[in-house]
A protein has these predicted regions:
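A structural feature that tracks compact, well-ordered secondary-structure segments
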Residues: 74-76, 102-104, 124, 128-132
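A short, N-terminal "cap"/entry segment at the start of jelly-roll beta-barrel domains
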Residues: 1-69, 156-178
Length: 178
């Protein structure tokens, strides 16, 4: 597998993003619009992207939910005995482990986790997520204040190593269930 440091591998790096939406207008109108926003988002309608070993789907983002301009949440699914990219970013993140077991490495230190645990990645930490379970993928809810960091132009994010480009044996046809 050839990896290039500047390789733009994922669609989310290619698409146009809204980093900060315009904040202008009458307070009464903005407040009315805020009250009209849905408070429940049906994530089953959002497809998973990625693969073949790590999949992601956005749940809440400034692009999809104007009520939430400073937070985002997504679900990551990583197949057994695999891992995500080794990377770092300026924003902190909280990972709630929904299913499976695995470990993270944060700035060289290993931390084991399993379903029901929460894992915190601090600001500026170089980290990587691993799915250790032999039979079940790791399913993780990720919550970040990344939009707020982007607003303050704290844009640094870098991949050190990409995830595997080939599926793990026995998981060649895996797709997360919606």
């Amino acid at each position: 597998m050839s990896e290039k440091p500047n390789e733009e591998k994922w669609e989310r790096w290619q698409k146009k993003r809204i980093f900060v939406r315009e904040v202008s207008g009458k307070y009464s109108e903005a407040y009315r619009q805020l009250l009209e926003q849905p408070r429940v988002y049906k994530s089953k309608a959002v497809p998973f992207g990625g693969g073949p070993t790590r999949f992601e789907k956005s749940i809440i983002s400034p692009q999809a939910a104007t009520i939430a301009q400073s937070i985002e949440a997504h679900i990551d699914v990583t197949t057994p005995k695999s891992h995500g990219q080794k990377h770092g970013h300026m924003n902190s993140a909280v990972f709630y482990i929904l299913e499976g077991k695995g470990h993270d490495v944060h700035d060289g230190k290993r931390m084991d986790w399993e379903a029901g645990d929460a894992c915190i990645v601090e600001n500026g930490c170089v980290h990587q997520h691993f799915s250790d379970g032999p039979e079940r993928p790791a399913r993780v809810l990720v919550m970040k204040a990344k939009p707020l960091f982007l607003f303050f132009n704290l844009l640094f994010q870098q991949n050190v190593h990409y995830p595997p480009s080939e599926p793990m044996p026995g998981w060649e046809n895996f797709r997360p269930e919606e």
